[in-house]
């Protein structure tokens, strides 16, 4: 079973590392090509393109300028420990054991606008480049055209390496659009998390992101191999709803959260 998740905008390069083990990202030739384009952007260009504040634009212009083709423990850290959004709160990688990290390295992949596809222990220099960014580049008008079939081919290689053909899509629509499902050698399953709010069940972004991380961790902790085992996911009050689920989309619901 292979899990795919989105990256996070929030990064952490300060907390103590839960492991010293690391690998190097595999698509850095592509990243370097993108970085040439990014380095031509002024802070004003970045603010407009990414729809961010002047402060964040300045920070990311500096990150682009400082980015190096050589990755070391001085200028980078493992991707799974560098990302710090809602998904990664649910995943809680800082509590993993060395055995967990080894398992995760084989069974989890992170999509990325700059790095394409990251393994958990791949060193990552800080950046912000969301997959939906309309960044014109030598391969097209946006990052989907830039990455083309590269990410899908990498996912197929990872699927073959880890031993079965089940791909669990815990990424956002923005990021999963970088994957070509028809070219995947996989049974693709997309879990959907619905929370009750005022009597209605709907996807609430904050809760759904955290739930994606919790499901990834559930798969890792329990070394889950089968689709039926995945349906047993019951963390934080979620439960599988067979009547609303299909072969490709698993619906999980949760009752209203009391604050």
UniProtKB/Swiss-Prot annotation:
Q: Which InterPro entries match?
A: YaaA
Q: Name one Pfam family in it.
A: H2O2_YaaD
Q: Which domain of life is it from?
A: Bacteria
Question: What's in the GO CC field?
Answer: cytosol
Report TM segments.
none
Gene Ontology terms describing biological process: response to hydroperoxide
Provide the family line.
Belongs to the UPF0246 family.
- Name of the molecule in the record: UPF0246 protein PBPRA0561
> Per the UniProt entry, what species is this protein from, by scientific name?
Photobacterium profundum (strain SS9)
Q: Where is the organism placed in the taxonomic lineage, from the top?
A: Bacteria, Pseudomonadati, Pseudomonadota, Gammaproteobacteria, Vibrionales
């Amino acid at each position: 079973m292979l899990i795919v998740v989105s990256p996070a905008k929030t990064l952490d390069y300060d907390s103590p590392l839960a492991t010293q083990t690391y690998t190097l990202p595999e698509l850095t030739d592509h990243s370097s090509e993108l970085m040439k384009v990014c380095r031509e952007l002024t802070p004003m260009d970045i603010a407009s393109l990414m729809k961010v504040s002047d402060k964040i634009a300045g920070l990311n212009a500096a990150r682009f300028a400082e980015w190096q083709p050589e990755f070391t423990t001085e200028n980078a850290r493992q991707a799974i420990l560098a990302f710090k959004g809602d998904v990664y709160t649910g995943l809680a990688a800082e509590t993993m054991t060395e055995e967990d990290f080894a398992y995760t390295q084989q069974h989890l992949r992170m999509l990325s606008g700059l790095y394409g596809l990251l393994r958990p222990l791949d060193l990552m220099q800080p950046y912000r480049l969301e997959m939906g960014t309309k960044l014109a580049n030598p391969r097209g008008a946006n990052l989907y055209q830039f990455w083309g079939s590269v990410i899908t081919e990498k996912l197929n290689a990872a699927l073959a390496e880890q031993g079965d053909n089940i791909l669990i899509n815990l990424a956002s629509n923005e990021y999963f659009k970088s994957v070509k499902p028809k070219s995947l050698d996989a049974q693709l399953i997309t879990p959907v998390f619905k929370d009750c709010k005022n009597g209605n069940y709907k996807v609430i972004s904050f809760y759904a992101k955290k739930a994606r991380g919790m499901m990834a961790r559930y798969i890792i902790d329990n070394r889950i191999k089968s689709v039926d085992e995945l349906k047993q996911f019951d963390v934080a009050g979620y439960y599988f709803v067979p009547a609303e689920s299909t072969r490709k989309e698993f619906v999980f619901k949760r009752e209203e959260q009391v604050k």
